[in-house]
Structure formats: C-alpha cells, structure tokens
Amino acid sequence: MSAPGRVWRNLPAKAKAKVGAVLFGLFLLAAVIGPQVMPYDPSYANPDPSLLMARPSAQHLLGTTQTGQDVLSQLLVGIRLTIELALLVGVIATAAAVLVGVTSAFLGGFWDEFLSLVSNVFLVIPALPLLILLLGYLPQRGQLPTIIVLSVLGWPWGARVVRAQTLMIRNRDFIAAARESGERGWRIIAFDIIPNEVSLIAASFVNTVLYAIGASVALAFVGLTDLNSWSLGTILYWAQGQQALQLGAWWWFVPPGVAVALIGTSLVLLNTGIDELGSPRLRATRGAARIAGRRVWPTDPTPVLAQLTASRGRLGGFLHSFSRGSLLDETTPAGGELR
Amino acid sequence: MPFILRRLAFYAVAAWVAITANFFIPRAMPGNPVQSIVAKYPTLTPDAIKALELMLGGGQQGSLWSQYVTYLGHVFTFNFGTDVAQFPTPVSSLLGQTIPWTLVLVGVSTVIAFLLGTGLGILAGWRHGGWLDRSLPGLMFLQAVPYFFLALVLVDVVGIELHWLPTGTGYDGRTTTPGWNLPFIGSALQHAVLPAFTIVITSIAGWMLQMRNVMITTIGEDYVVAAQAKGLPARRVIYTYAARNALLPQLQGFGLAIGFVVSGALVMEIVFAYPGIGLLLLNAVSSDDFPLMQAIFLVITFTVLLANLIVDMVIVFFDPRVRAREVHR
C-alpha cells in the first residue's frame, strides 16, 4: 500500500474524522468551482411570472425566490463567500491566539497575568451583542469589516488553550537543553514549542472557523452585512424578509440552513477526530462484550464466570445494573451465604 | 483571597471593560452617530440631542474624562437616556418590558438543556460505545444547526403546516391580558414551547459531548476502579464517584457557554417574533437606534456575568477543594 494511503488510513483514526474531512472537502470544492458552474447569475431576477417563487424543477434545481432569482446559484456563490470569510478569520484569529498564548506562557510574570486576564474578560463578555454593536456603528458594512471584527473577538479561547499547553511544554527537559545550548527565545518558540502544539492549534483553528461561520451567518441574518452580496446568511436574510416562511417556500430557506449545518457538522466531526487522535481513551470502544451469555461493558468489573449463569437481554441487563440485585451479584461469593 | 472574592474582582474588571468599550466604541468608529441619528429623527428635542452627544460623543461636552465620569454615573443609576426610535420613551423602560421574557425563556431552557445533556452524557460516557454514545454524531448535526434556522423550520412545520402550536409574539394579545392570571400564563407557556424546544435541541449535544468526554476520563481514575472493587452498586459508582467529579469541568464550561447560548437565543427570538431583548436588538439595529443598542449590550453582558457568578457559587458547593483552599489561607 502506498504511503499516503497508509497515512489516510491511520491518521484520522476514526470514521468520524474521515466523514468530516470528506464533507468539508465537498463544500470546499463547491466554494472553489461554484461560481464557475452556477447555472444563472444569482442576482438576475427573471421577469417570467411563472418563475416567481417556483418550486424546484429541471431548470431551477432548487427553485426560485420571490423575484425569480435562482436559489442554487445563490447557494453556490454563498458557500464560497461564507467559507472564504470563515477561513480568513480562522487563520487570523488562530495566529493571534498562538502569538498571545505562547508569549503569555513563555514570558510569565506580569505579562502572563495581564494577557490571561484580557483573554478571560473577552471570553466572558457575550460575543454576538458586542459584534452587533461594533458593526452597527460602521457606516459601511461588508466582508472586510466583518472579517476584522470577527478576528478581533475570535482569538481568546485558542489563546487560553495554547497557553496551558505551552506552560506544560516549557518545563520539559528538551526546552531546558535548548536554553542551555544558547538558543534564542524566538527560536525555541518556533522550533521547539510550536511543533509540539500542532494538533492543538489545528483543533483551535477548526473551532475558530466554526465560530466564524456561525457568527457571520447570524450577523447577516440580522442584516449587519453587505446585503447586496450573496452569502449563506444573506440568502436567509432575504428569505426571512420576503416571507419565504409564511408562503411555504421551503426550497428557499432550507438549503442554505442545511448547508450551514452540514459545514458545521463536518467541522465538529473533524475536531472530534483530532481530539481522539490526541487522547486514545475517547475513541469509541467496541462496546459491550458478550461473556457467557451476559453483556459485559468495559466499565464493569471483571466478571466471575460462575456467577454469569443468569443471562439477561440488552435492556434487562442495563436496567439490572442499576438495581440492588446487581450489587448482590457482584459482591456475594459463589455460595451466596450473605443473602 | 477566597475563591468567590477573587471571582467577584474578575467580574468587576470584565464589567468595567464592557462599560468602557461601550463608551469608546461610538467615539472611535468612523462617522458621527449623533448626526446620523438627528438626520434620521428630526423630531428630537435639543435636550435629547445633548444627552445623545454625552453618550455617543461629538459636540461640545467638556473633556473626554469628564464625559466618561458622567457616563459612568449614568450607567450605575441605569439611566440609559431616551430612546430615539420611540421618542420619548426611556430606554430603561423598553428594557424592563422585554428582559423578563428573555430571562425566563432562555434561563429555563438553558438549565433544562444543561441538566438533560449532562445526564445523557453521564450515561453515554459510562456505556462508552453503547447506542447512546454512537448516536452522538447525529446529535452533533443538531448542534451545528444555527438556532434561528431550526426556529425557521419549526415555525414552518409545527406552526404553519400543522397548526399545533402558536408562533410569533409571547402571548395571545386578543384573548388574554398580561398579569398574574391563569389564561395569560397558560398562553405565555404555550407560546414559549417552540422557542424553548429550539434552544434545548440545539444546545443539548454540546453538553452531552463534553460530559461524556470528561466522564470517560474520570472512569479511568483509580478511585473509580477502587469503588467498583469494593463492590459498590453501579448506581453509586456512576453518580457519587464518577459523575460528581466529572461535573466540575462541565460546570466551568457552563459558565463560558452562557454567553454563546444567549447570543444564539437572541437571534432565535427574531424568527419567533418573541417579545424579548433579541427582537428589541434587531429593531434597534435596523433603525440605527444606537442608545438602545448600547444599553442592550450592557444589560446582556451584566446578565451573563451574574450567571457566571452563580455558576461559581455552585462550583464552590460541589468542589470541596475550592472550600478547603479558603480555610487554609
């Protein structure tokens, strides 16, 4: 088997991460080629009266909006804009998080206290109302201000996690060795500390992208974005504003919402995969084993075979494990004198 | 310093940051908010414009420092000025009308989601690899659904197609009057079912996943194995030994997630036209009602900080180590 193939089989460890990666890859593909393959101009309002809020058909696979615009085309452009924004925010905010987290742990003392306080304060202040406040004051609302504002508020969680990890690594022997051999501070950070935090930074990046998608869609839904551009949030904004719901035009508001949910799910799955890669305990075990006709879970005490005579079904066994009887099963010696 | 005092100091700092950001944001942003308000609402009295300048900057109101001190005084007396879109209603009375709706709805459903999710997480972690555990990826899909989108679908299916439950507004204004009477409370409950269901469904998976992960780690601890070896009943090992300890990180996560849940609930209220603070915020945004936006931001922040403080007290109750540290110092 080829090397990349083996990596692919071993790396994601679980089907969850694979499904997540494939799903996200599909959306990434849609984002890249979407604007080239979309059948219509997403803003073109077809004047044909039979195409106003038309159900899905062969010409319009996802139907049309109230003004005769093609929903599929809007969706394809919208996925691109949303993912583009989320990835940019992810890169900027994660870079800031690593910078703050590593600096804070590496410097220690006053700067550590100060930077930790700042990130904790940002964590505890609810983000969305603050985002709304910031964007509300801007005279021009577009992609760039949204990216800046989301990045400014998106780094504290990652910084906290990175700081904790750096504190742990900082005291390891190999860092001490690097210091003794006269390495400079930035070199230790870049070549000794950060490579040991790659999986953590990756998880933090995925989380930030997830946050950026949720927040940008919510902000667009509230109307705090450039409403002339097509993102998943603005499609939902127009669908809500033009009564798609009351008129029963599900093909208009369901696809963008499902797209957001699927992108989100793929990222959560990816993150779970990364988590399980780092912590084998969290990986799904095979569940209960059947020993002498009775289901034994990994958390159960090692069974004494002589007592496993009474065989119980799935539900019966589960309920029984909570009952007083199970206590006697597990503590009484084979003879059962204690009863 | 005792744990609670330390936390109190931290929340004081956080509140101060929020208040100060609220003061400087309108001054730092490009454009003059007061002028755009005056242009939009020409009926404002000179007094009101003066008050706006004090709040949002611009105009001649003395040094920045003296403006800041006056502003702080106003915040501490809950004087948020008069609303510009519904002039001359005070902002604080608009807040007073809407806060109870959001507080009851979001508070109750968040607690339900937390308890339910934690309970299911305990079972999923204990029976690691069981059917509940394997259903988690499906639940993650629900978690990734934006609150407001699930709300859209529920309004369409349950409210419009099936007519099972009322949607829109917080109570039936034609047949009931607000107050402590049975028809009103019944109507309000009926209107709250769908929004509450939305919050519970979308946030439960997060609690469940986190609790399951901590639970799995806790079960591997020696004291849990020891408890099992002693022959304690499974129920006692699960709840008194494993779950009680696994609950501590869960509670800390709860504190941090409150802001997130509230944010989601705000946008969800818009879909249900629920008369809470989220709908008020939307109206404020769409009508450039800056004083109202600022007041809402502060009120939400204070509420989240207060909720965090309550969570900290619960942590003190559950974690004897926190109490012990206080005694020793």
What do these predicted regions represent?
Chain A
Residues 123, 136-138, 166, 207-208, ...:
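Glycine-rich helix-loop "coupling/hinge" segments at transmembrane-helix boundaries
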